[in-house]
Each structure stands twice: as structure tokens, then as C-alpha cells.
Amino acid sequence: MVWFGGCTPRADLLPDAAALAGDVIVPVYVGTTRAQEAEGAWAAKIAGPLTYARVDVNVPKEGKPGIVALPDANPDPDRHFLTHSVTPLAGRALASGKIRGNEVVVTIHGFNNTMGEGVFRTAKMIRDFDIEALTLHYAWPSRGAPLGYAADRDAALIARDGLEQMLQDIRLAGARKIVLVAHSMGAQLTMEVLRQMVLREDLATFSRISAVVLLSPDISPALFRAQAEAIGDLPDPFVIFTSQNDPALRLSAR
């Protein structure tokens, strides 16, 4: 698991000048159905077409495993996660390009997440586990609000087509193996997309899913059984991790 440390503001993706002095820059590719606002930020409430971007993230050298430290009034690249740069990628850039290597890792965030939080968690995971495979983050339009559970649940369902399209783009770009890592409500979204691909007979994409990891999945046992029955043979390996201390699940249970 990757948690945010301290009582800090919510993460955003506004480039920070302090990041220019950082030594460790981790690139995270992002596919999102969040609509971009006029000033360039991604909206929390509006679902738009799937777009791509590359976010270069400053990862602090002094960071603890599993902890994302956000900046305070004095951002320090040695202690804080900072946005170094954001580069929009034109159109369906993945489908028209080529992916180095055979394997791609896709992370899917859960309930109550800003876009920055999902990207920073992904950068932390890449750094902690020394992931060499190309890693993408799917950012669906969570409201990023503790009391926005119902709205997030609807947004996750609306985001199914965007995630399926992103997986199709990854396949078309040459990936032979796709590993899905989903947290909380993102796990339900992931299961829904696997089910949707099977029902739509998109076996060309489904067959590329080589592994699934669900972290503290926010799915009832009855719903999971129904999804799994519709999917049939689940990708192998298929791993589920649970945690009694997951803050997203504690909020959803209220």
C-alpha cells in the first residue's frame, strides 16, 4: 500500500519550480477521462474523452517506503513529491506509437483521489519496486472528496469505456503482457472492465491481461462472484490484498 504522510493539502499536478533541483525524476504516463479546464488543470467532476499525458515526478531521495510526502509552504525536492513537468500527448498517442518491451503495468486509483494523488502513488510504486516496465496510470474523475462516495461510484462506472479503450491502445502499441494494479473502488472498475471485454468479445485485448492485483478492493462478495462468473477464466495470477487500516474503505463504510 502507498499512503500520504502528514496533514497536508491534496496533491495537484501543477509544476513546481522546486522540482527543478531534484535528482530523482520518475516519468508516469497517464490516461484520463477527466476533462481539462481552461487553465490546464484536470476537472474532478466532468468526464471527457480519453486523453494522454506524461507527468515527470520528483521523487524525494529521503522518502520512506510506501509514504508519499506532499509539500508544505517550503517545498523541498529531497523530502517532497513534486510535479516537475506535464506534457500532453496528442490524440491516441499510445495506439500510434510503440511500447518498449513486452510488459506494461497499469495502475487504477480508488475512491476519494485527486489526479495528482494517483500519479504520485504510481511514481512511488515505480521507485519502491524498481519497476522497469512502462507504467501508466488510469485517472478516472473521482471528486476527491471524503463525502463523495456515491458520486465516485457513478463516475467509476462511467469510466469503464475509457479504461477499456486505454487497454486497447496499449495492445495496439505492441504490449504483449498487461498487469493491472487497482485500489479500492478502482478494483470494482477493473472487474467491470474485464467483464465488459468478455461480453463484448474483445478477447484480443483480454488475452493480453497477464496479471491482476486488487488492493483493498471495494467490492461486495456477491458482486465479485457475479463479475467473476461472467468473466470466466480470470487472468493468472490474480491476487487480492486486504487491509483493515485502508482509509478509503473506512470512509466508504460510514
Segments predicted by a language model, with ranges:
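Cap/lid segment of the alpha/beta-hydrolase catalytic domain
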Residues: 139-154
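Gly/Ala-rich beta-loop-alpha elbow adjacent to hydrolase catalytic centers
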Residues: 163, 182-186, 190
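Short glycine-enriched nucleophile-adjacent loop
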Residues: 187-199
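Flexible, membrane-associating and regulatory peripheral segments of lipid-active enzymes
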Residues: 3-105, 112-131
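The feature captures the conserved acid-bearing segment of alpha/beta-hydrolase catalytic domains
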Residues: 216-254
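Structural cue for short, hydrophobic secondary-structure segments
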Residues: 107-110, 137, 181
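Alpha/beta-hydrolase active-site loop
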Residues: 150-172
